[in-house]
Amino acid sequence: MIAIGLEGSANKIGIGVISHPGPNKTPIILSNLRHTYISPPGEGFLPKDTAIHHRAWVVRLIKQAVQQAGVKIEDIECICYTKGPGMGAPLQSVALAARTISLLWGKPVVGVNHCVGHIEMGRAITKADNPVVLYVSGGNTQVIAYSAQRYRIFGETLDIAIGNCIDRFARTLMIPNNPFPGYNVEQLAKKGKNLVDLPYGVKGMDASFSGILAAADLLAKGLDESLPLEKRLKTEEGELVTREDLCFSLQETIYAMLVEITERAMAHVGSQQVLVVGGVGSNERLQQMMGMMARDRGGSVFATDERFCIDNGIMIAHAGLLEYCTGVVTKMEDTTCTQRFRTDEVFVGWRD
């Protein structure tokens, strides 16, 4: 069975075509295309501008994806699109595109939860059995485990997502958004050597990132080279703190928080596996820290590369086809989108 997936919940529009050869067989990725809306340094991406970008690219990406996949329209079983969560205007653009090609091609539609798409793609690529899932992206931060045909949320952010924290700090430092701010922060962090104290916001199984961001933004004012030397930000030893040091300190602090709550979830559910998904999951330092924790417990960590960690259409096609095979079809009048669509709202009928 073959499905096409349309993803556009944030600043990336992705189209993917996938084939499921049969039960218990590895899915075949036929095409996986993506284009990113990039805003100037110091700026985020506005929903209206992002939606305009998606509408400008969606038709050509659909054509290219189908052509690259080497399939005919009649071979496609269903059209899968991101129903939510995400930003309203970009989601509407993708939903409109899905409805349009459904009517043109005469194919059924399946609305997919963005978070479940990340999880199922991660499981398919890494072959992780029944892991605790750390889902970290620009809009979401959740610690998840599967139970009784639901992906249960054991911990999450109490305010902003970890990716949003990183992106906003990148704007403070005027770090470029190309290819994406989190990657550029990561590269600067690799050059940092001084660990600056930042608030540590773990509340039981949940985490808070807004206070850390506010503290980092305040410290960043001390990096201004036009300030008198005595007012510049320094370490306790009197060494000047650099933007690389602040990026390093931010990463070390927020990733340590994620490791703590993930380890607690592993102990609770008795799992020896961690699957890291979402755009922030492509960060090498996060994977390294999570791997150290997992190995100390005799376990292992699983993650994918940026083709599948970062938002993409193939994960929507994969999760949508799994739902479709259980009899799920979204009626045309229900092909709406919602900015708030929790992971645990989805009935996972394709798992035992």
UniProtKB/Swiss-Prot annotation:
Key words of the record: Activator, Acyltransferase, Cytoplasm, Metal-binding, Nucleus, Transcription, Transcription regulation, Transferase, tRNA processing
Protein's UniProt keywords contain Transferase: yes
Single Gene Ontology MF annotation: N(6)-L-threonylcarbamoyladenine synthase activity
Alphabetized Gene3D superfamilies for the sequence: 3.30.420.40
Reaction(s) catalysed by this chain's protein: L-threonylcarbamoyladenylate + adenosine(37) in tRNA = N(6)-L-threonylcarbamoyladenosine(37) in tRNA + AMP + H(+)
Compartment(s) of residence: Cytoplasm; Nucleus
Binding-site positions, substrate: Y135, V136, S137, G138, G139, D167, G182, E186, N283
GO BP of this protein: positive regulation of transcription by RNA polymerase II; telomere maintenance via recombination; tRNA threonylcarbamoyladenosine modification
Superkingdom of origin: Eukaryota
Principal cellular location given in the protein's record: cytoplasm
Co-factor: note: Binds 1 divalent metal cation per subunit.
Alphabetical list of InterPro entries matching this protein: ATPase_NBD, Gcp-like_dom, KAE1/TsaD, Kae1_archaea_euk, Peptidase_M22_CS
Subunit composition and interactions: Component of the EKC/KEOPS complex composed of at least BUD32, CGI121, GON7, KAE1 and PCC1; the whole complex dimerizes.
NCBIfam families: arch_KAE1, gcp_kae1
Protein name: tRNA N6-adenosine threonylcarbamoyltransferase
Gene: KAE1
